[in-house]
UniProtKB/Swiss-Prot annotation:
Residues 183-253 are annotated as: Small ATPAse domain (RuvB-S). Keywords: ATP-binding, Cytoplasm, DNA damage, DNA recombination, DNA repair, DNA-binding, Hydrolase, Nucleotide-binding. It comes from the Bacteria. Its EC number is 3.6.4.-. The keyword DNA-binding applies. Residues 1-182 are annotated as: Large ATPase domain (RuvB-L). It is found in: Cytoplasm. This is Holliday junction branch migration complex subunit RuvB. Mg(2+) binds at residue 67. Homohexamer. Forms an RuvA(8)-RuvB(12)-Holliday junction (HJ) complex. HJ DNA is sandwiched between 2 RuvA tetramers; dsDNA enters through RuvA and exits via RuvB. An RuvB hexamer assembles on each DNA strand where it exits the tetramer. Each RuvB hexamer is contacted by two RuvA subunits (via domain III) on 2 adjacent RuvB subunits; this complex drives branch migration. In the full resolvosome a probable DNA-RuvA(4)-RuvB(12)-RuvC(2) complex forms which resolves the HJ. Has 3 domains, the large (RuvB-L) and small ATPase (RuvB-S) domains and the C-terminal head (RuvB-H) domain. The head domain binds DNA, while the ATPase domains jointly bind ATP, ADP or are empty depending on the state of the subunit in the translocation cycle. During a single DNA translocation step the structure of each domain remains the same, but their relative positions change.
Amino acid sequence: MDKRMVDQEFHNEDTDLELSLRPTQLKQYIGQSSIKSNLEVFIKAAKLRQEPLDHVLLFGPPGLGKTTLSNIIANEMEVNIRTISGPSLERPGDLAAILSGLQPGDVLFIDEIHRLSSVVEEVLYPAMEDFFLDIIIGKGDEARSIRIDLPPFTLVGATTRAGSLTGPLRDRFGVHLRLEYYNENDLKEIITRTAEVLGTDIDKESALELARRSRGTPRIANRLLKRVRDFQQVNEDDQIYIETTKRALQLLQVDQHGLDYIDHKMMNCIINQYNGGPVGLDTIAVSIGEERVTIEDVYEPFLIQRGFLERTPRGRKATALAYEHFNTTNEKRE
């Protein structure tokens, strides 16, 4: 699968920009107002009790700020943070080494926590509940269990697939926070702030236009802004103007709904080749040269969310809105 401008997943080239833009306090964090309000209360209460914050589960689509929030939690609690990914914890000993190195109150952030192996997950249960580890040393008749006491800590788990977590793991989190897609006003504010960090000016129309095409995702908004800035600098403009923005987005093949060439390819396939459906996912995959799982997990969720595609027992079907949008877009291209 090729990288897309509107891909919500992390790209390597996003690293420097995301790090430079990452807020360190809740008051600097744009959007997710309900989550911020709740965290302010939970953090203040924990500090008043001089206790670690309850374990926190952050879930929602990629690119919405779960990693950023985990760092903010550590900063607000005035403790250190250790960051790891679920797949990197292959053995119970890997987890034990990390947990035993934490200081009282520290935050352990596990990204992609739904990908923890079952053996590691079972070791994590008593660590989360009672702050101890039971480790088996040796094999066979010589095997024995060693209990390791741990300092109280806060586990922050992040996942894009909360439904994939086992019940016992999910229930051990005291705080569950779902990150929602951002509205246009919040994205516009994020884009304006990013432009300042990048050292460029952007007019209000351009910031709003980018916000509209960013799929409610700050990561995509910042990525699009960087590319539009390229056009501005080559044109030697003193700021990013709306004309340059629209021209750049047209060349990048990102339309007014944030749909790109792959979205158009898939929807045109359903509408033109299969009369709007219903058509099976395997048939679509063969027709557009993509894997079934990629279509199901990456491409179609946004199309369904925006009302262009629906799932039926007989397959995928284009909606009336899809006919209106894609036929109009195709006519403009012709």
